[in-house]
Amino acid sequence: MKFGNFLLTYQPPQLDQKEVIKRLVNLGQASESCGFDTAWLLEHHFTEFGLLGNPYVAAANLLGATKKLHVGTAAVVLPTAHPVRQLEDVNLLDQMSKGRFKFGICRGLYDKDFRVFGTDMSNSRELMNSWYDIMTKGMIEGHVSSDNEHIKFPKVKVSPNSYTQRGAPVYVVAESASTTEWAAERGLPIILSWIINNNEKKSQLDLYNEIALEHGHDVSNIDHCMSYITSVDHNSNKAKDICRDFLAHWYDSYLNATSIFDDSNQTKGYDFNKGQWRNFVLKGHKDTNRRIDYSYEINPVGTPQECIEIIQSDIDATGIHNICCGFEANGSETEIIASMKLFQSDVMPYLKEKSNC
């Protein structure tokens, strides 16, 4: 079993930005002492939904402050920055950490990011393809060039080269079928969303495996990751109550982040995400409290035994044994770390990989 901790850097109303960033560093370091393998960092811009505009910089800090902890991005919005500049960042982190950096990528969801950084969001799929190809070639061969419709530059040497053979491991944050298929074609592990239930997780993995096998990949040893909102307490109601205020503000902040500009919903190529929101509305989840209640049904929020049952059910359905938990809904920094420690002592040891028998 592997266990990760994803760090939101959401700014709740009671904290200023200095406190959020300080807490990020402290929780990253606590991840190592609490037995987590990886701390995952999320990229966000122009909103309190996440204060981390550059996860590469934050990853460098946490890698330097820890000895064994892996640090990953979940995820870098790949199309919004130059691929060679990002390649240099990834290789440098890979070198300086001696292979402890994990490179999680996505094509992006927020119109605001593309608009401000001058990238055509409707072209995000093609840019994702091109940027990924350029970067992986540079990791493997040590030099890059490009002469396609998206970017042109002559052959250059990449420095530093990668520390890890064939480059830092790549993960893909995947929600839609098209992104799942894209990752499967390349045999890349995916990070599954915390907002989908057991059956949806299994269906996503079934789709992935079908496509990956068609492209000649061995699906038996791909390091997929399931993500969760997590709160552990011996009193189930207390675990749920302490999260509710945080999650209410966080969910509302997410909605605001998707619509900073009035015409954000006009972008082409994001039909899955629009459909997902329509389904949420039809299920009554537009109401914040109902959305939170549903989250509690599919995420490990409750007693240690309740958390074990929810996660183990997903492990048995999918075969995934890399579990990534987010604890920031648990209140103060002290309360967050207390929940992490209880997860370490009363949940981690009792989760088992799916038996192949």
From Swiss-Prot:
| Taxonomy, superkingdom | Bacteria
Mind naming one GO cellular-component term on file for this protein? cytosol
Q: Does the keyword Oxidoreductase apply?
A: yes
Catalytic activities: a long-chain fatty aldehyde + FMNH2 + O2 = a long-chain fatty acid + hnu + FMN + H2O + 2 H(+)
Keyword set, alphabetical order: Flavoprotein, FMN, Luminescence, Monooxygenase, Oxidoreductase, Photoprotein
What EC number(s) does this enzyme carry?
A: 1.14.14.3
PROSITE patterns from the entry?
BACTERIAL_LUCIFERASE (PS00494)
Which top class of enzyme applies to this chain? oxidoreductase
Q: Name one GO molecular function term.
A: alkanal monooxygenase (FMN-linked) activity
Record's family?
Belongs to the bacterial luciferase oxidoreductase family.
Q: What does the record note on quaternary structure?
A: Heterodimer of an alpha and a beta chain.
Q: What is this protein called?
A: Alkanal monooxygenase alpha chain
Q: What is the originating organism of this protein? A: Kryptophanaron alfredi symbiont
What gene name does this entry carry? luxA
